Amino acid sequence: MSVRMGLIRKKADWNVEDFRAYWRDKHGKLAARAPKLREYWQNHVTDRLQRGIQFARGPWDFDGFSQLSFDDQQQADRAFNQSDMAAALIEDENRFIGHLHIVTAEQRVVVPVPPQEERARLLKRMSTLKRRPDVSEEDFRREWKIHGDYVQKMPGVAGYRQNVIVARELVKGEPCGYEDLPIDGIVELWFEDTETLDAAFSSPEGKVTMQHATTFIDEITAFVVEERRVV
């Protein structure tokens, strides 16, 4: 499964409520027409606090994350670069989006996410990760996989997915290098509520987990989001 993720910043002259409504009610229906699309989720940012973590934040200040799942990256590229809807999608994005970065990720499920009815009641946090400058891409991926074993032992984790970034577009449609968009991974974590999240990271298991994180991660930029399934 290949996941195409849009890292979205609204236009400065749009308020948060109008941005969310347009993305949800108008743009979502257009993007849902992408051929071969398996799933489409919108994640609306509601909080930017570094709950439970002591890492520096990166420069990112997103208002939302889109997640569109395809069988492979080639299907995603055709849908958004070669299909009949591609031009219409860009035209609509220019109405309400100020900045849009695109990343393609290989998704790894560490703690399975509950069924949708239960999932809808949970708190979700997404975080972008940047590796330490002395850690290679290969070593980062290896250590992050090991890190998943630590997270599994933390109390209260209702779901956990790792999205390993394999392609980047600082400007949509223009592939770029790591230096232009230095994000190595995107975390998805689900908890019952903020109290459960705080308790997980302050637990002995949580402290061990975050100590391991310091061995390969330089920046963690956390966002609490409200997720909505479109497809």
Residue positions per predicted region:
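Macromolecular interaction modules
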Residues: 1-231
